[in-house]
Design a protein with these regions (language model features):
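A shared catalytic/ligand-binding motif for oxyanion handling
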Residues: 1-161
Length: 161
């Protein structure tokens, strides 16, 4: 069979994506004040915040054998406050209100949680095509992916390959 030709896409670069690696031990909500400062510095109302937050947002759906006392309750509350302040939506939970899928697992796979996720601006949620938690490879974390349709014109000099 003949292979399809590769397709080159042009992307508009928009300063809107804080990459988050939340503290992996202790309950440190003040860390997310830094995230807020970064978002304020960007000065854009289109935000895609991505990363390993090291917090489960929904204890019932996003964790398996992961106790709430261990899972940083003050930090979780702070993330919800940030979501309200910047009108951010948890893409996975928005698309899959009851689905259980975990992006992190302990070595023995007994403890699992959805610690890696995307938060996007409410005004961008209609542009979300999909999100996935993929496989893990030589890691305790899985790949998480976000698929967006870009509604902006892609034919000006500010685009990059």
């Amino acid at each position: 069979p003949r292979r399809p030709e590769p397709v080159l896409y042009r992307f508009t670069v928009i300063p809107c994506t804080p990459n988050v690696y939340g503290p992996s031990s202790g309950d440190h909500p003040e860390f997310f004040d830094t995230v807020c400062t970064h978002i304020d510095h960007i000065g854009n109302d289109i935000i895609v915040a991505a990363g390993d937050w090291n917090v489960v947002l929904n204890m019932k759906l996003d964790s398996r054998n992961y106790q709430s006392t261990v899972n940083r309750p003050r930090t979780r509350k702070k993330i919800f406050d940030v979501m309200v302040q910047y009108e951010l939506i948890d893409v996975f939970r928005n698309m899959y209100p009851t689905k259980r899928k975990y992006s992190w697992r302990k070595f023995n796979s007994i403890k699992q949680g959805r610690l890696d996720f995307f938060l996007v601006s409410e005004n961008l949620i209609s542009e979300v095509v999909g999100t996935e938690v993929g496989p893990s490879y030589r890691s305790d974390h899985s790949i998480v992916q976000l698929f967006l349709k870009i509604p902006y014109p892609l034919n000006d000099e500010n685009n990059v390959l």
